[in-house]
Amino acid sequence: NRYLGLRRDEQGRFLLRVEPGVVLSELRKQLSKKVLPTAGWDQASLKAYDEFQEAPEQFFPTDPTEASACLGGMAACNASGARSYAYGPIRPHITGLHVALADGDLLELQRGEAFAQGRHLSLVTAAGRTLELDLPGYTMPKTKNASGYFVADDMDAIDLFIGACGTLGVVTELEIALQAAPAVVWGVSCFFD
């Protein structure tokens, strides 16, 4: 449940590395206060943290109903919530994963670095072993869907593991993209007789 580091990408977004046990409600509190636990961070992360403290307030847009959810569990089920119509589920907000495979080997996945060729995916593990995977041929529906593995032609490899419920490997580290918090949040309730 540790916070492992912070960096900025080429788009200026803050990318936060965390262990899977970080609780969403605690993350929200720390982001709103602009205070993150930085023990053990390297110099590059501390520099990004200084920039984070000077930047407009940041937030993590995924909002499942259960605020006590851990980020690892949210990644495992591709969590979404009331804000998903505006921000989508957690999948597009995860930029990196470390995954422990059943045989003990590790995968380090970064969004935008490894893609399937059609429905074939080649992944190189931390031990240097190449995994050759043939992805299922079904077509994902264009509606909200949480059944089966996410697959698409030429897909980003990271997306196969998000929403796989831990069946392909255990997430040991996540990198999530933060966004500038909206200036105003509105809620509307309607009552009808």
Predicted regions and their residues:
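Structural motif
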Residues: 12-13
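Extended, alpha-helix-rich binding/interface surfaces that flank or overlap catalytic cores
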Residues: 21
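Short basic, glycine-rich beta-strand/loop surfaces that mediate nucleic-acid
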Residues: 1
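FAD-binding subdomain of flavoenzyme oxidoreductases
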Residues: 4-6, 25, 29-33, 37-193
